[in-house]
Structures are given as structure tokens and as C-alpha cells.
């Protein structure tokens, strides 16, 4: 297995590119992007909440219910005393309307969605999420007095949840950020940076920033990669042989040759606007990542194919059906409609 990292460079393109969103958000750098975008891609607003940044991470589409689950960015809980306001993160469920035919919608009326704040226990400060069995597996970042780890939640009311993992070698995780499930063996791979400590809601870390592999059947947990600055988003290639990890520090290194360990590590690409965050693959093996000016798309070889420009940037996103991409833009939820043949590798629909 190869671990490929996506690092970053900071420059003025984030602002310059974002201003072009309204004119044409779909930017092509390579002819292969035309096939992915289709002849008439669209970008539309699904929901906006001007009060809180409800659409920050996770992005888990449940096809059987046509629902989407997202986690917010941190915000100050107004229900606590002003002098001791606590940071809070909420899970939001968005019930989507039936999807219109991709790329053929003209003079659209505003899309109406139903929005519900999910109340559940055992997922303190939720962040990344992924489809898992009959529900969702979340990264629970934890707090000063609650455990961090991985938590499973049912995707239908009453949204029962439970911890699946809370420690490594009797040491608490720092603040798990994102996760992915290997499609062949069901193992769960996740990143654990120190954001929680840096952002003031977790104790001082007792583990370095690393990538872990958890085997639910045997309860085995092992470190599969280290040496990261801030490991963040994580995704597998469609064949499961390459693991992509977004990081804010460029690095090179070697792993251990083993079926459950990476054989090599390499820098895959550099995000040219802001810090790379969420990362996904399509069924062709192309790599998509959210960053400071929207979503960038690379070929499996690391060639920049195109971008979906979004003012304010994109922390995370997920594929829906037949060319849909749900884009998390903090206080806005957007939907891009690309070619129907452009499908996410995770669900393949």
C-alpha cells in the first residue's frame, strides 16, 4: 500500500479565484475535466444558516433515505454563561428533495430542504464521518472531560450512538479528525491531529499526530503512519491500494512492507490555495480535495485537472447520486451537478 499526502502552499489565488465563482465556478486545466464536469455543470445553494457554520465537516450521504449529515465548525454556545461560554459542535441532518435530472435544470426555483439538529450522546465535538453499516461512524474529538475516539450513530431516529474506540495503549486519542473504511476488509483508518488542544477544548496530547488502523472484529489498533504535521482528510483509491492523507506539512518517508501497513509514502500534490482538508476519490481514481478556493481535482498521477470555485473555500464535501457533490461551505450547503458518470468511489452511485 502507498500513502500519498496532499500538502499546501499559500498564495493569493484563493481570493482571486473565489471572485470568479458567480461567473463560472467550473475551471478546466486539463481536457479530462470536461468529461468529469459534463457539458453543462451547475452549482446551486441548498441551504444557508447565517447564525452558525453548520456545514463544516463529515458530509455523509445516506442514499436509502436521501438524507445528508454534516457537522458544524466550532461556535460559542449561547446557552452557557457569557464569561464561560463553551465551544460547541452540532450534527445536522438535511432531508433532500428528489434529485432533478443532472445538468438539465433551467430556471430552477429555490431548493427546499428539511433541516434537523440531531440530538445524540457519545459523540462529543463530532467532526469527520463516513457511511458504516446501517448508520454513520463519526470522529468524536472529545472535550476536557469527555473521551475522544470513534463513535457509531444510527442514521434514523432516535439516533442511538455508542463509542467503538476510545484509546490506544491506554492513552487517549488527541482529537480524531477524519476516517475511512477499507472496502475489502472493513478496517477503519483515521487521522488524529492535535487540533483539539490547539483550539482549547482538549487536554495536552499524550500521543503524536498519527494515522491509525482499527480492526473492529479483533479490536486491534495500530499506527500505520506518522511524521505528519497535521494529518486531516483521508481517503482510499478505488482499488484500496493507495491511501490519501491531507496534511499541512510536506514530508517524505518510508513505511514497513506489510499487508496492513503502507509500503511507501510520497507527496502526491500541492494545494495552491489555502490548506487542504477533506479528500475523496471518484470511481476513475481522480482525487478531489477541499481547500481555500473550493474543490481541486487531480488525476491519479497528480495532474491538476480542474476546480470547482467556491467563495470562502470548502472544508469538506461528499458525493451523492449521478454526478452530485454536496459542498460544505460553513454557513452554506451547496450542490454541484456534474456529468452523471462522475461518481464517488465510496458509494459508486
Positions of predicted regions on the chain:
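Beta-rich, blade/repeat-based domains predominating
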Residues: 50-65, 121-144, 168-188, 195-196, ...
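Beta-strand-rich domains and repeat architectures in extracellular enzymes and scaffolds
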Residues: 44-89
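A short helix->beta-strand "capping" segment at the edge of beta-propeller domains
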Residues: 19-53, 105-117, 261-266
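Blade-loop segments of beta-propeller domains
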Residues: 86-142, 164-168
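Fungal secretory targeting signals
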Residues: 1-18
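Short loop/turn segments that connect beta-strands within beta-propeller blades
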Residues: 95-99, 154-159, 215-219, 299-303, ...
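Blade-level signature of beta-propeller repeat domains, shared across WD40, Kelch, NHL, RCC1
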Residues: 316-349
